[in-house]
């Protein structure tokens, strides 16, 4: 008998930071990144930047959770409060959040672990 698939969700957050405050953004993001990646249900977290538009970042998080958990449990974690408070001072516009449920099975999944060899 096959195991019941675990729910999985991908969270994509677009942030538009004042280009003069990028270093401050990275500094205030580190404690949040460390807290999120320490969560047992977090399976992936990467930050991307838009090379054509300074100050635009995309955070991509993958979770072994469903959207209900993300909206009713995860977003209420205490470590987000100081992060969001600090962000208000440097964002040029409100952040945008998109949630996606993972396709079932592994037909549409691949991970090249060699790309992450420097991770502890």
From Swiss-Prot:
Gene3D superfamilies named among the record's database cross-references: 3.30.70.100
Induction remarks: The expression of the dibenzodioxocinones biosynthesis cluster is positively regulated by the transcription factor dibT.
Entry-linked InterPro entries: ABM_dom, Dimeric_a/b-barrel
GO molecular function per UniProt: monooxygenase activity
Chain ranges of the ABM domain: 9-99
Its EC number(s): 1.-.-.-
Pathway: Secondary metabolite biosynthesis
Origin superkingdom: Eukaryota
Signal sequence annotation: none
Keywords annotated in UniProt: Monooxygenase, Oxidoreductase
Family to which this protein belongs: Belongs to the LsrG family.
Protein purpose: Putative monooxygenase; part of the gene cluster that mediates the biosynthesis of dibenzodioxocinones such as pestalotiollide B, a novel class of inhibitors against cholesterol ester transfer protein (CEPT). The biosynthesis initiates from condensation of acetate and malonate units catalyzed by the non-reducing PKS pks8/GME11356. Pks8/GME11356 lacks a thioesterase (TE) domain, which is important to the cyclizing of the third ring of atrochrysone carboxylic acid, and the esterase GME11355 might play the role of TE and catalyzes the cyclization reaction of the C ring.
Protein name: Putative monooxygenase GME11364
Source organism of this protein record: Pestalotiopsis microspora
């Amino acid at each position: 008998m096959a195991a019941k698939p675990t729910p999985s969700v991908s969270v994509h957050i677009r942030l538009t930071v004042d280009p003069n405050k990028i270093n401050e953004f990275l500094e205030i993001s580190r404690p949040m990144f460390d807290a999120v990646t320490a969560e047992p249900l977090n399976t992936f977290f990467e930050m991307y930047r838009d090379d054509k538009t300074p100050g635009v970042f995309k955070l991509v998080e993958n979770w072994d959770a469903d959207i209900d958990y993300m909206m009713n449990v995860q977003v209420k974690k205490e470590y987000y409060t100081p992060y969001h408070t600090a962000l208000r001072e440097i964002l040029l516009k409100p952040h945008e959040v998109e949630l996606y449920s993972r396709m079932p099975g592994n037909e549409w999944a691949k991970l090249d672990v060699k790309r992450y060899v420097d991770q502890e």
